[in-house]
Amino acid sequence: MTTNSRPSALQAPGLQIFSMLKSSEEDGFMSSSLTLDSDNIIGVTENNRQEFYSTWRKPSLLSSRSVLHEYSPTIVGSNDCTFSPITVGKTTKFFNWDDIISRIFMQQPFGVTHQFFEEFRYSIITSHFLNDMNHYRLSLHLDQSIMNFHKSSTLLKNVPPKSVPFMATKYGKLAVAEDKKLYFRQNFNYLSMIITSYRVLTQLKKYCRKKNSPGLKRVVILILVAVYLSIQQEYFRRHLICYKTLLKVRKVLESLQQVDVMIHKYHLRFKEIKNHSFISRVSLISIADEHSSVIKELLVFSSDALFYKLKSIIPDIVIFSDTSELSKYCELYGIDVPNLYYNNTTTVKDLDGKLYRLKLLKKFMLCCLLSLDMTGNENLSNVNMRNALNKIFPDYMARVQLKKKYNPIGTFQNIVSLLRGLHSLLSTVLVSLNDHKQILYAFPEETSTNTGCERANVCSFSKNDKLFQALNYLKMIENNLLAIDIRNGITENDRNIIEDKLEELITFWKTSKICGNISRIQKVSPTNTINHGFHLDILKGRKSPRSSSVQGLSLERKVDFIDVAESVNDSFENDTELEEYEDYDCQEECSAGSRQNHRVDFIGKDSCRKPDFKQLSDNELRRKLDERILKLAQENREGRERLRTAKSFELLRKAQASMSVKFGFQKPLRDDAFLESRPLSKCKVSSEETIPFLYELKGLLGNDS
């Protein structure tokens, strides 16, 4: 190596790269070259270029710009280590091989993946969709973050626009394209270099006799240099891919949040215009209809485009997910697998259904990203979830079988390419929504009187309700049906499970009393709860035979009979009681004088039978007294109701007759207009409770005329 000439490209030190990659880059990471931005790379200006190259020969004279920092991609997770050219002093006769080898293998290329995946999961969990309440309070700030791969520093402004030869660095060969992008080409394959080095060292150990020969040291040093370069290039490549993956995920989450906010605003505006057109009558109603149609078209376009895009990329993401973890995340974030199946396989036409299925699919995509398989252990997969995914996505099992072996970096590369297409669609949808933003502020804001929630709860039953429990049984049957592996057919075990669930549901439905609960929740007549005037209904716990017959007879009910010795006086007493009740019913509508005579006769007859009642026991006397009081109270109440109803309908007929005279209706028209054209026996509204409705109908007919 000469000291009076500039070192060649092969002797250039490793560049310290801290770059923000452009999201519009089309080249993949597995292509022939790696792409970086040139705006944010620490470089060397003309003033310090000579110093930069001279420090390669004198490591102790390295400037502060060439020293690696804690955010360098080569030392993430290691603060006490800096990489510099390995030199051996001239006076050093023996040096420690263990120290050199430990420094070479200190950075494992695979260690960055686990650190990245924790930050990757944290970014998704704290997103707008999975943590709506506290996502702005849970930002992650780490000293050793994957995002520290890029740090703004001195710009490389003097990079030539074209560089024909590649410059060799420890991260690969560097070249500059016309669009100011930096391309890195990996020239040391990590696995092949490790295997080749291991074979060479094995052969040296087998055939080399002199362990301290200078030739052996030179060969070993060359092997260690090659291993070191392969480790650095693989580490840089993995760190770069993880950085771009996390960057793309954050951009997609931000775009999803912006699109979701705009869709929510348009949906609210659409509801306001629709409600305003029904509530108020304004002159701008034609403009409102026009704007509502535009908003509906925007919402349908946005929801359909995003839904079908997610539907196309989710099958490519879910094959990399661990089904057991995916099942846990779906349960945690309230994603119902049968509901996902119905929304993914059926056609939805209404706007609310389109927005709901889009929201459901977005959450499912994030759950798929959270459950990416980082262990490569497929033995712990959830069989039920796998069968359900095979029904939701018909080619799921075929894709899983064609998938390559466990390779997390390859998985992240595929995810970045899928998210890049989704991000471009989100940008297009967001531009379209922003172009029509003036519709959101076209009218003055109306104050909404409806303070209820936007969407009524579909199932308003409590957990203790029988119907709610029956729906839970049906949901369990749906989950069992989706968990059946259709490739092997329906086995006897699956059939028995479904039949047992159905039998449990049928048994539960038969034993429940849902119909009884519904029948009890009926409107009670005001005459049964509100009693005007004096009445004798003092024993509400007991019911008379006449009132019990109205509710229906129960032939299965047991009746207790009391054995009483019947005599001639008892039979005579029963006959006279029946005659008294019939006499009382006939004379209730007569004058007060006849009632007084009836009372006198009644008292007189009772006075004749006073000695007969002394022969009865206390219980028999109490029972007879209760029956008589209940009978009198029931007859009194029914008589008052009949009288009140007759008077009310008489007043109604008089009012109808006066209106017919006032408006001059002819006989046929009057027969069609009023209810007196039909007899009351044919009228469905013949109770006292329906009279207010008849008055309202009369008022409406009068207003329309």
Curated annotation (Swiss-Prot):
<keyword id="KW-0472">Membrane</keyword>
<feature type="transmembrane region" description="Helical">
    <location>
        <begin position="215"/>
        <end position="231"/>
    </location>
</feature>
<comment type="subunit">
    <text>Interacts with MYO2.</text>
</comment>
<feature type="glycosylation site" description="N-linked (GlcNAc...) asparagine">
    <location>
        <position position="275"/>
    </location>
</feature>
<dbReference type="GO" id="GO:0045033">
    <property type="term" value="P:peroxisome inheritance"/>
</dbReference>
<feature type="glycosylation site" description="N-linked (GlcNAc...) asparagine">
    <location>
        <position position="569"/>
    </location>
</feature>
<feature type="glycosylation site" description="N-linked (GlcNAc...) asparagine">
    <location>
        <position position="344"/>
    </location>
</feature>
<protein>
    <recommendedName>
        <fullName>Inheritance of peroxisomes protein 2</fullName>
    </recommendedName>
</protein>
<comment type="similarity">
    <text>Belongs to the INP2 family.</text>
</comment>
<keyword id="KW-1133">Transmembrane helix</keyword>
<feature type="glycosylation site" description="N-linked (GlcNAc...) asparagine">
    <location>
        <position position="574"/>
    </location>
</feature>
<keyword id="KW-0576">Peroxisome</keyword>
<keyword id="KW-0325">Glycoprotein</keyword>
<feature type="glycosylation site" description="N-linked (GlcNAc...) asparagine">
    <location>
        <position position="517"/>
    </location>
</feature>
<feature type="glycosylation site" description="N-linked (GlcNAc...) asparagine">
    <location>
        <position position="343"/>
    </location>
</feature>
<keyword id="KW-0812">Transmembrane</keyword>
<dbReference type="GO" id="GO:0005737">
    <property type="term" value="C:cytoplasm"/>
</dbReference>
<dbReference type="GO" id="GO:0005778">
    <property type="term" value="C:peroxisomal membrane"/>
</dbReference>
<keyword id="KW-0675">Receptor</keyword>
<feature type="glycosylation site" description="N-linked (GlcNAc...) asparagine">
    <location>
        <position position="379"/>
    </location>
</feature>
<comment type="function">
    <text>Required for peroxisome inheritance. Acts as the peroxisome-specific receptor for the myosin V motor MYO2.</text>
</comment>
<dbReference type="GO" id="GO:0043495">
    <property type="term" value="F:protein-membrane adaptor activity"/>
</dbReference>
<dbReference type="InterPro" id="IPR026235">
    <property type="entry name" value="INP2"/>
</dbReference>
